[in-house]
């Protein structure tokens, strides 16, 4: 496998602005991610004193896994005060979209580069967002069906979706295996299929909760890189977070005000408003089997799904006795994460790093310094067959990844069509319009006849448009093989109108290239980059 960088012309220039240190963007972060001085300064910040306790919690969380010596070494390094590079993601079905793996690679690569450059251990940590409760975001994935050259949605079906954190949810193993069977039914069978399939079955058999199954897959793929894993909803981690939960509750007004004020400043700089929330408390509580948002009405903290209410002291007591019932929303989660870890850099997706720009005031209010915020690597896999098709149709990979193939596909069809035929029909449309204009002069004093004439004219014009449309459709049918190939290019490099990594599932790559495709012995050596990466097989 080989890797090349690619400079895409992107509509969203946010990451390029970070790369170019534009003050419009960098002013909303503590550090300029593109400057070496930022790393020099961040690495000199004193530790928070929680690293040893945190290493014990992570070791406890990962205890049921068969840890590699790389992981054990990193747990020891963390206990000894090593700083971390961290990022997180929801626990998607079968690993979720490819960008989950790419985020983990970003964490691993940046931590390795910093370790080598500064001659000090920097530990890669992946944060599983098990406190999230939006099951519809994680219960499905997509498989590319080669025979039909289309993407197929694969979903875990249940009549009782969870109302609380996904970490609390135990899926039906038979239904999960049915979803797995559906996935492998859609993709082509290769020499690697049985190995990848059996790996997934073993993981489903071994673990019970939704996030533990996800953890098992991530560990299996990335264990040899030394990645450390932690679930945001892990009870022992919640015990550590009690002091900050209490501070967030005590400073509820200041936290909310600082968030709102910073968000206003970002929109004044023509940045999009990323965080949409009406709460003024920015914490959830597990109550009546549901994860419910807290909101202060001036006297009590009320819930968004039931009538129950609390005083501040009620909540402080719950935090002290049962901190696992409390969880963060999008505003407080980043601060809690960085309060726990001695972080050099946080790795986020494009949307994440945008909404972090709205949170600097919250970090300052809670006396937690925002780490360096870095965009994750963006990667596309280029199959040999796809490369051949690009050459066959003289298509630029940069253009296809950014914009798709529809314009080129339509041009191909037009070139196969008869220009004389289309021009004659267009001329007939022009004549029809002229006839309409002439006839209109005879009925200018009769409103009903004007409407009749207008309707009749539109019917004729629509028929001519339909004639051209059906004529071109017949051309497409005559060139069915080429149409399928255009569709294959699109669904591979620009699926659903976006990047491959936002739709395709990692299991598909493993099925095509091997169960060890993401392992250190097979995956190409990468360096951290703001540019788009192309990995060719």
UniProtKB/Swiss-Prot annotation:
The keyword Signal does not apply. It holds the Pfam family Rossmann-like_BshC. Residues 415-439 form a coiled coil. Its EC number is 6.-.-.-. GO terms for molecular function: ligase activity. Keywords: Coiled coil, Ligase. Signal peptide: none annotated. Belongs to the BshC family. Involved in bacillithiol (BSH) biosynthesis. May catalyze the last step of the pathway, the addition of cysteine to glucosamine malate (GlcN-Mal) to generate BSH. NCBIfam families: thiol_BshC. This is Putative cysteine ligase BshC. It comes from Staphylococcus epidermidis (strain ATCC 35984 / DSM 28319 / BCRC 17069 / CCUG 31568 / BM 3577 / RP62A). The gene is bshC.
């Amino acid at each position: 496998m080989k890797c090349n960088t690619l400079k895409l012309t992107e509509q969203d220039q946010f990451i390029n602005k970070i790369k170019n240190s534009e003050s419009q963007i960098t002013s909303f972060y503590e550090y300029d991610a593109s400057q070496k001085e930022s790393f020099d300064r961040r690495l000199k910040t004193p530790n928070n004193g929680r690293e040893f306790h945190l290493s014990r919690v992570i070791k406890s969380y990962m205890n049921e896994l068969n840890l590699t010596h790389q992981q054990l070494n990193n747990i020891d390094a963390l206990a000894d005060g090593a700083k971390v590079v961290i990022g997180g993601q929801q626990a998607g079905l079968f690993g979720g979209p490819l960008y989950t793996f790419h985020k983990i690679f970003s964490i691993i690569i940046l931590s390795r580069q910093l370790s080598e450059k500064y001659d000090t251990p920097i530990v890669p940590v992946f944060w599983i967002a098990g406190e999230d409760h939006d099951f519809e975001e994680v219960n499905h994935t997509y498989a590319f069906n080669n025979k039909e050259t289309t993407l197929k949605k694969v979903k875990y079906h249940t009549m009782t979706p969870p109302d609380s954190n996904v970490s609390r949810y135990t899926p039906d193993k038979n239904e999960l295996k049915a979803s797995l069977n559906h996935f492998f039914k859609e993709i082509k069978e290769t020499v690697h299929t049985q190995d990848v399939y059996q790996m997934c079955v073993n993981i489903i058999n071994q673990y019970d909760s939704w996030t533990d199954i996800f953890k098992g897959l991530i560990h299996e793929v990335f264990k040899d890189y030394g990645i450390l894993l932690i679930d945001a909803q892990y009870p022992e981690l919640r015990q550590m977070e009690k002091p900050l939960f209490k501070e967030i509750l005590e400073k509820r007004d200041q936290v909310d005000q600082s968030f709102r004020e910073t968000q206003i400043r970002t929109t004044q700089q023509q940045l999009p408003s990323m965080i949409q929330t009406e709460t003024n408390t920015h914490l959830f509580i597990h109550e009546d089997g549901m994860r419910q948002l807290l909101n202060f009405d001036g006297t009590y903290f009320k819930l968004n799904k039931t009538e129950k209410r609390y005083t501040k002291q009620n909540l402080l007591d719950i935090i002290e006795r049962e901190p696992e019932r409390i969880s963060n929303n999008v505003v407080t989660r980043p601060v809690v994460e960085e309060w726990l870890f001695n972080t050099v850099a946080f790795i986020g997706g494009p949307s994440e790093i945008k909404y972090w720009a709205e949170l600097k005031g919250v970090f300052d209010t809670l006396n937690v310094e925002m780490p360096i915020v870095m965009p994750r690597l963006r990667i596309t896999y280029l199959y040999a067959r796809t490369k051949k098709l690009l050459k066959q149709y003289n298509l630029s990979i940069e253009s296809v990844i950014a914009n798709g193939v529809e314009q080129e596909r339509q041009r191909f069809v037009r070139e196969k069509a008869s220009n004389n035929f289309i021009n004659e029909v267009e001329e007939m449309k022009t004549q029809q319009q002229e006839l309409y204009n002439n006839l209109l002069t005879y009925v200018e004093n009769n409103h009903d006849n004007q409407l009749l004439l207008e309707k009749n004219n539109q019917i004729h014009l629509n028929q001519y448009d339909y004639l051209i449309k059906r004529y071109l459709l017949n051309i497409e049918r005559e060139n069915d093989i080429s149409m399928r190939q255009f569709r294959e290019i699109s669904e591979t490099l620009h699926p659903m109108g976006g990047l491959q990594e936002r739709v395709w599932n990692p299991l598909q790559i493993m099925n095509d290239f091997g169960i060890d495709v993401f392992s250190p012995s097979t995956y190409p050596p990468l360096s951290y980059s703001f540019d788009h990466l192309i990995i060719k097989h």
